[in-house]
Amino acid sequence: MGLRGGGGRAGGPAPGWTCLLLCAALRSLLASPGSEVNLLDSRTVMGDLGWIAYPKNGWEEIGEVDENYAPIHTYQVCKVMEQNQNNWLLTSWISNEGRPASSFELKFTLRDCNSLPGGLGTCKETFNMYYFESDDEDGRNIRENQYIKIDTIAADESFTELDLGDRVMKLNTEVRDVGPLTKKGFYLAFQDVGACIALVSVRVYYKKCPSVIRNLARFPDTITGADSSQLLEVSGVCVNHSVTDEAPKMHCSAEGEWLVPIGKCLCKAGYEEKNNTCQVCRPGFFKASPHSPSCSKCPPHSYTLDEASTSCLCEEHYFRRESDPPTMACTRPPSAPRSAISNVNETSVFLEWIPPADTGGRKDVSYYIACKKCNSHSGLCEACGSHVRYLPQQTGLKNTSVMMVDLLAHTNYTFEIEAVNGVSDQNPGARQFVSVNVTTNQAAPSPVSSVKKGKITKNSISLSWQEPDRPNGIILEYEIKYFEKDQETSYTIIKSKETAITADGLKPGSAYVFQIRARTAAGYGGFSRRFEFETSPVLAASSDQSQIPIIVVSVTVGVILLAVVIGFLLSGSCCDHGCGWASSLRAVAYPSLIWRCGYSKAKQDPEEEKMHFHNGHIKLPGVRTYIDPHTYEDPNQAVHEFAKEIEASCITIERVIGAGEFGEVCSGRLKLQGKREFPVAIKTLKVGYTEKQRRDFLGEASIMGQFDHPNIIHLEGVVTKSKPVMIVTEYMENGSLDTFLKKNDGQFTVIQLVGMLRGIASGMKYLSDMGYVHRDLAARNILINSNLVCKVSDFGLSRVLEDDPEAAYTTRGGKIPIRWTAPEAIAFRKFTSASDVWSYGIVMWEVMSYGERPYWEMTNQDVIKAVEEGYRLPSPMDCPAALYQLMLDCWQKDRNSRPKFDEIVSMLDKLIRNPSSLKTLVNASSRVSNLLVEHSPVGSGAYRSVGEWLEAIKMGRYTEIFMENGYSSMDSVAQVTLEDLRRLGVTLVGHQKKIMNSLQEMKVQLVNGMVPL
């Protein structure tokens, strides 16, 4: 394409130029991105543009049509042979629609002045662009000096006569932004000062973030801000039939992209999510809670005829307990027990039966025993008295047998065995029971219930008692059995027809145990309970003096107890442990605190005080608190209290994705009754486990089951009733955060990385609020899903500090490097939320360095020493200064000076809302001199030449560049900074990191500098 130059017609097109120009225009008719809204596009205007050129012999419109006969508007000017050119092209009024800013895109061609013979003195290769704001769309009387200059436009490529011959089109595209704009519209003007130019198209547009539905929240069309670095926070509105879970927000960037989604909406009960909408549950389906994933089919024996049902109604004769979940089938009372048999033994009856044929669909079947005493003559029955005892119990029986004792002899009884379950009390129908009629036999007497001591000497004890409550005949005699305490195998029998005896020949000052039973014609009754009495010491002469030993012993015990209490108070333990009167006062002062079965507490700092409960816990109104499962006497109770039992048949294991100490980690799918199948992660317990390993394995589930937060890994349930034992959690597609970052080095924006850190901090705030200390927060223990949502995991193992030179925490799962652990936790085993904050700072460093190993190859001992001396990790490459400062705050030696997790979340939210604060990076030139001392580093002396060093790190391609720029020795190389690398032409980020990391290792021998706090 070209304009005729030289002595011909200065503004006329060269032969064939119009055709080429039209071809270029057609090729440039590309659709604008969805985030751009055109205010003017000269390529799409069908009629006259209405633009004005002056002087009239300046800009010239070339009117052509495309293959669809649509007009193509092109303006050209080529007054290159004449001096002092001032040719203006004015557009018509362009409505700005009240937008704060607009962008202008120009497509044009420009002739190379050197290719125009004779025009070098007057030819120009630029033109000027102006605008004038106006509320008047009819005003054209605008003076030149009223226009505001936007820019001088130069071509990236100009064309020559040779390009015309080769049919090469060099079309330039320039974009300029103008803002802020305050009036309804504006005019554009293009000034030619002597160039040979063709203006192919002019497009005026503004950018917006298009309306979108994300996480069931609708975000409207949002015009971008006038500042190119500004992020606009936009609140979303929940779609129809949804409710807010966490206030939905997103940020609109200057490029028209939605970034950093926060919060979400959930379909309300009776609706499920489909294609970013909440669809009604159709009849026969229900959804009880917004947190349920989808509509579920009504469980067995229930139905719903309406749409949007939140629960299902039970069929006739079927019921649901108030505590039954809505996903559970409706059930009915059980049928009667079957095949009851009895076995009479004097005045005891043993009953046994078979469970009912129909349990009603429930597992909570129990039995109730009704006892009736019947008159053999009248046939009338009455309830048995309270003297009848039931072994093990009368109500709530779980097994299918019971024994009734202490019945009357020669009496007719009717026993009714009724089966009941959780919905029996809702059944208005008749009771379901089976009856058994029995007659008791002649019976032996009941046991003696009360024994009184009489005269006691050093060698004898006198006793008396009352006749049994139920003699069941004439008492023929009593049998008294006694023995020295703890000598039960050597006993003496005395028989007496009276209710009193004296046992002689006993040892002075010794304890003896007595038992008594009665005999009738039916035989001996049972022995009484044990009664313990003690003979007098040798010094005691009479029963009057028999109380002296008791007094002496009591005084002695009292003195000992007093000494213990005084010593305890003086040691300060009483105050720390809440014992004695201090504990009593505390109980009075705080009546809202309820203790069960007592507690013990280790001596520690006030902020670290924790109560360890035995088979119970403390409850505070309105506060959800983490409960340590190790405080349960039965670990299985903790598992079943906090974790849901899942049938193994509901789980499909697909493949192994990892392995641990206890077994394999697999991915699979979970299909629960009435719910859709969804992916899960499954931890299995290996074959041949010990009971201790099983407790440790399920301990993690007991902990995880207490948490419910979008940034904490969610426990679906456990499998404990079949093998293998399994823990089932949600599936995180991208795995551990450290591995994911290494695989995607440099692929994310700073805002995305901050979003990840914000999620981790939010999860840790939740744990901290519950009183849970993680102890092993590291990127390897953070899982990330396909939406880049990070979730805290690994709650399973207790940690013990070993006395080894590596000073590493040891768990049942292996050693945890101390490089994530706060110094007070290393030195004093003080684990608190503040020590978790230290670990969070290390996680921040891992994220911003894309998974680099903290402290590189330093040994644990070197890390401990360096941290104790006040040195800290240097800033990762290209790390915003605000984030690195937050890391340093997390690494304060005084744990009380570290920020709390709620403060960290607030700081990160502010950075996300103001992304311009993330543009200030840590001074790159200071990074190398901020290194930590490494243990046994590879120093500069390990390589004989720069080339050998670069080859060793597989960067040999840069050898010649280093040598040409004066880096000929290893000493000079050791001083290279990141800016030096960029100046040398090392532009690939991965190569920069590899070279800088190697320099960091060498620096220890040349620069003994760190980052002191």
From Swiss-Prot:
It comes from the Eukaryota. It is an enzyme of class 2 (transferase). Its EC number is 2.7.10.1. The keyword Secreted does not apply. Residues 36-214 form the Eph LBD domain. It is a single-pass type I membrane protein. This is Ephrin type-A receptor 5. It comes from Gallus gallus. The lineage of its organism: Eukaryota, Metazoa, Chordata, Craniata, Vertebrata.
